């Protein structure tokens, strides 16, 4: 039965190999069960609610990928978009988390429309490779800075203008001092929490240097244990490892779609969709090629359209359940490396995610010092793609540079993408190489300019 459903013999694998591959994938990406609640709680969401949405959404969508597409690919809330959701949209723009979920839901529908039509192919072909790579690298730097800040390894110090003291005296101390500069500085290395995060970062990096499977998860677990052993964290009373999930805390259907439309979050929705599209496409093609399901040289990608459809539905489903963008995880490559070739690998991973619904008490124990280094390391991994950008060609390198630096330093994925979309066609025109630019890039550039001028 399983052989017929998943084509095990045809793809040269077995039930045992597929299950072990599914377990391997789960181990390498299980850190998201600790990371997502910690990041989204900063946006005002309940940790237990986020865990339920992450485990349930990731589990169901991953199982769907296995059953309907037969790809060994797992899905869960994407790290970069978790950070974008919390730090840019909610904390940066002052949007409620319900409205932000509404924007995620809409982006999923847009992604689905793009996937089901030829527009997807136009965008994928029309966006230059340097821009696609730059988006990945920029998001990597973005989440690394967030990880450094959350860990305490980096601090933001405020420099006051010279006449601030006089203004405060004149207003009898009632003036809120204006800041002339906000500087990124080294954090307080005398803080126990900061030192714990530093230990976690170094320990996890050493594990990865040894190529130990599940390094990120091991790092989170060991750091959490150290936190309680050293007294930096205290165990809650009446603690139990397992508990029946409290669905009354879940954020099911708490998204606010009308507000997302009314507030004109077009750029935010566009950014979510843009990143979803290229993250999904890159991960699916890369993993399917590694699993020998697809052949990029011949252009054969059987099931790619169906896989992207499941991914797109997963985005909106995640928002309905109460979590940020659910997308294909690059960690799926670990399962493929362990021999995974079919959807049985994904189904195994999905079932393990569902089992984790009962681990809410355990997740609540994990401190920021254990999860923030994960952001730094994932960012470092994403940075490796920069080698594929041709910086010798100014018309390719400079737009990519703008994307990369503006994402972290303006705390916005949207700003980085927008700058690149404007700069790329502009430089090509000035260089007399306008024919190298696909028409879709001109359309996107005009839309971005209109957004910044009129909205």
Question: Language-model segments: what does each one mean?
Answer:
Residues 23-30, 60-63, 67, 144, ...:
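Hydrophobic/aromatic residues within the transmembrane alpha-helices of Major Facilitator Superfamily
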Residues 93-222, 347-455:
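Membrane-embedded alpha-helical modules
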Residues 1-50, 182-186, 218-305, 446-450:
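Helix-loop-helix hairpins and the membrane-proximal interhelical loops
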Residues 44-63:
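Loop-to-helix transition at the N-terminal end of transmembrane alpha-helices
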Residues 2-32, 36, 57, 78-87, ...:
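Helix-loop-helix junctions within the multi-pass membrane cores of secondary transporters/permeases
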Residues 34-38, 54, 62, 83, ...:
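Transmembrane alpha-helix boundary and packing residues in multipass membrane permease domains
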Residues 58-79, 110:
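Juxtamembrane transmembrane-helix boundary signature
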Residues 38-49, 88-99, 263-266, 367, ...:
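Helix-coil boundary and interhelical linker segments in multi-pass alpha-helical membrane proteins
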């Amino acid at each position: 039965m399983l052989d017929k459903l998943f084509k095990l013999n045809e793809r040269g694998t077995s039930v045992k190999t597929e299950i072990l591959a599914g377990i391997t994938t789960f181990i390498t990406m299980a850190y998201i069960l600790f990371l997502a609640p910690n990041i989204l709680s900063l946006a005002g969401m309940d940790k237990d609610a986020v865990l339920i949405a992450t485990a349930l959404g990731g589990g169901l969508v991953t199982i769907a990928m296995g059953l309907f597409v037969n790809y060994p690919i797992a899905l869960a809330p994407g790290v970069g978009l978790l950070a974008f959701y919390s730090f840019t949209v909610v904390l940066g723009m002052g949007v409620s988390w319900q409205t932000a979920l509404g924007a995620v839901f809409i982006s999923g529908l847009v992604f689905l429309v793009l996937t089901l039509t030829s527009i997807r192919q136009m965008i994928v072909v029309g966006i230059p490779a340097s821009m696609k790579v730059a988006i990945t690298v920029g998001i990597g730097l973005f989440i690394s800075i967030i990880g450094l800040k959350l860990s305490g390894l980096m601090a933001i110090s405020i420099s006051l203008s010279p006449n601030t003291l006089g203004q405060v005296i004149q207003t009898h101390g009632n003036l809120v001092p204006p800041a002339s500069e906000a500087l990124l500085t080294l954090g307080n290395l005398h803080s126990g929490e900061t030192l714990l995060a530093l230990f976690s970062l170094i320990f996890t990096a050493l594990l990865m240097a040894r190529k130990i499977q599940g390094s990120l998860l091991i790092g989170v677990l060991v750091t959490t244990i150290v936190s309680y052993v050293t007294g930096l964290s205290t165990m809650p009373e009446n603690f139990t490892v397992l508990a029946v999930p409290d669905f009354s805390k879940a954020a099911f259907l708490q998204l606010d779609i009308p507000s997302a439309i009314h507030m004109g979050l077009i750029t935010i929705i566009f950014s979510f969709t843009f990143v979803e599209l290229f993250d999904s496409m890159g991960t699916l093609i890369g993993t399917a090629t590694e699993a020998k399901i697809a052949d990029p040289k011949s252009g054969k990608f059987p099931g790619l359209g169906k896989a992207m459809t499941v991914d797109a539905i997963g985005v909106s489903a995640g928002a309905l359940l109460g979590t940020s963008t659910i997308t294909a995880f690059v960690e799926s490559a670990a399962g493929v490396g362990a021999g995974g070739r079919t959807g049985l690998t994904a189904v195994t991973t999905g079932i393990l995610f569902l089992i984790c619904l009962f681990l809410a008490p355990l997740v609540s124990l994990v401190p920021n010092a254990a999860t923030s280094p994960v952001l730094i390391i994932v960012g470092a991994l994403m940075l490796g793609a920069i080698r594929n950008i041709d910086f010798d060609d100014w018309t390719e390198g400079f737009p990519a540079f703008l994307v990369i630096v503006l994402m972290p330093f303006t705390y916005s994925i949207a700003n980085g993408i927008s700058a690149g979309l404007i700069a790329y066609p502009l430089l090509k025109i000035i260089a007399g190489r306008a024919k190298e630019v696909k028409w879709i890039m001109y359309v996107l550039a005009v839309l971005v300019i209109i957004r910044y001028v009129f909205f």
